[in-house]
From Swiss-Prot:
PROSITE patterns: CHAPERONINS_CPN60. The keyword Transcription regulation does not apply. One of its GO terms (molecular function) is isomerase activity. Its EC number is 5.6.1.7. Its main location: cytoplasm. Forms a cylinder of 14 subunits composed of two heptameric rings stacked back-to-back. Interacts with the co-chaperonin GroES. It is an enzyme of class 5 (isomerase). Coiled coil: none annotated. This is Chaperonin GroEL. ATP binds at residues 30-33, 51, 87-91, 415, 479-481, 495.
Amino acid sequence: MAAKEILFDSKAREKLKRGVDKLANAVKVTLGPKGRNVVIEKSFGSPIITKDGVTVAKEIELEDKFENMGAQMVKEVASKTSDIAGDGTTTATILAQAIFTEGVKLVAAGRNPMAIKRGIDKAVASVVAELETLAKPTRDQKEIAQVGTISANSDATIGNIIAEAMNKVGKEGVITVEEAKGMETTLDVVEGMQFDRGYLSPYFITDPERMVCELDEPLILINEKKITAMKDLLPVLEQVAKMSRPLLIVAEDIEGEALATLVVNKLRGTLQVCAVKAPGFGDRRKAMLEDIATLTGGQCVSEDLGIKLENMTLADLGKAKRVIVDKENSTIVDGAGDGDKIKARVKQIRAQIEETTSSYDKEKLQERLAKIVGGVAVINVGAATETEMKEKKARVEDALNATRAAVEEGIVPGGGVALVRCVKSLTGIKAVDDDEQSGIEIVRRAIEEPLRQISGNAGFEGSIVVAKVRDGKDGFGFNAATGEYEDLIKAGVIDPKKVTRIALQNSSSVAGLLLTTEAAIAEKPEPKKDMPPMPGGGMGGMGGMY
């Protein structure tokens, strides 16, 4: 085991502070509409140019192990805020630095760090409660577009596309971000339930020009297992043929005799049919088939439920207004499922989303939820170069997350004003002693820091701006994009309350931990050994070679 180096008290905190400052100073230049860019070298390819705080934070590793510990703690603040709220990473980093910097000074002056932390926690709880009273729900598409625009570093195109996507697929709908082939940023919307499985045979195509199979008012047979023998499928096929209705079969697989018979009947015109594989794998496949059954009002043929394929009747088949199947995807539009059963299914999936700890499972559950509730929107991000594409895509993802947060918990005035308005809530807090009061004062000063930084990045004197905003009321604040003092909510400078809240809670949590650190332990760097000297002389016996 390698030897360890241990630092105590102020020495440990000083080293941690240096690391915090190095990371925070690199991140905070990106804040606000006039935030600056940061260039990041990559080991291969062109460098990244970004204004995204979490991207900058993730790239930072410091040589000194103690300084690096401080930097990593603040990096955790940024990434955690990004994971939960989707934005506010730079604000969280600035708040963490401000709280820790002020706290270190007080601890060095002899204050009790535990009492300071208690004061910080009380103050943060009070600010969060005040934010709740300031928040207003998002009323229309315009406000959603404004949130997206602010989060995308004042890019109105991105804000408008996100608002349009939310309008089309609903608040619960899935919105994904992809790289476009051209320079234009566009929006594609898929209505209904779509899953990534195409037709099993090109003979099922009804429109050879577009290479798609379209079925109007089809019946839908949902089967969990493989279908190979025709005798199992025959009873239900005969009933469907009598009805002269199209049929979509969704099964784990259809092969051999069963597939051949379906193709022959399709070509003869006896039966308008299309067969597709079931989406997903394992337990997820079962769940998705149940989703399709609920949405279409059908019954899934499953051994678990004791239902057999040969016993299926027309009443067990699902129904939809239309089904479109291409080479790669199947879309069910306007399923005829029972409204109450669909609501119950949605409630069940939402409960699973709340319970799961895996981000992968959560993503897949959200996809399932969106497919049942609304549809899927794809934002195709276009740019002139690959470097710009990566930067723009990151901004779109940020803006999308911020917009979702705004819909969830409402909006507050942007530009750092909401936190300044919360200062008044700190006057009523009763502190047990002076040390606890000093913790409250730390938060009072720290929550003005984002506004100070936004105005500083825009080329204005931060303390003058803060003083003027402090004297105002409600949404009155400084619009760094125009350099004007105005009502920020009317001007469209708004932030999601959730982003502001999460940024403050995460930053105060980590800053409090750093403040109450009394020892830091890291591996001692091993002294570098000198290279052994090169052996003298040439290689013997090779004198005659050239």
